């Protein structure tokens, strides 16, 4: 009876092993999915940016015609003044960054933070662990490090 209980306990432990195993959050597949998500966010941000951007030079055709007509009688001082006015109008027309764009940038930044912590303890602990051979990434490319000279 005791033997069957031990065998049954071992069998249950083997079955439950997959459920209890560690599943790192930022493994290769998840990082790749985050990169794909980042690309999609950038594409969406570009589309939103095209729809939101105000017209920077709305009167460019009128300005060309005026420039051709007044080309003969413009003084350099008046030309500088008109350029300064044009630059000030452009600055006034450019809208500040919208909350939607900042959200997209925040979401895109998640992939960067995920890459920096792609192991068990983070980059600093990986460096410490790689020297001692006890870290999460001590077994890379199928080669084993020897801790002691055995």
From Swiss-Prot:
GO terms for biological process: blood vessel diameter maintenance; cGMP biosynthetic process; cGMP-mediated signaling; negative regulation of systemic arterial blood pressure; neuropeptide signaling pathway; receptor guanylyl cyclase signaling pathway. Pfam families: ANP. It is found in: Secreted. Heart ventricle, and to a lower extent in heart atrium. Residues 52-75 are annotated as: Disordered. InterPro entries: Natr_peptide, Natr_peptide_CS, Natriuretic_peptide, Natriuretic_peptide_atrial. Keywords: Disulfide bond, Hormone, Secreted, Signal, Vasoactive. GO terms for cellular component: cytoplasm; extracellular space. Residues 1-21 form the signal peptide. Exhibits natriuretic and vasodepressor activity. Belongs to the natriuretic peptide family. This is Ventricular natriuretic peptide. It comes from Anguilla japonica (Japanese eel). The gene is vnp.
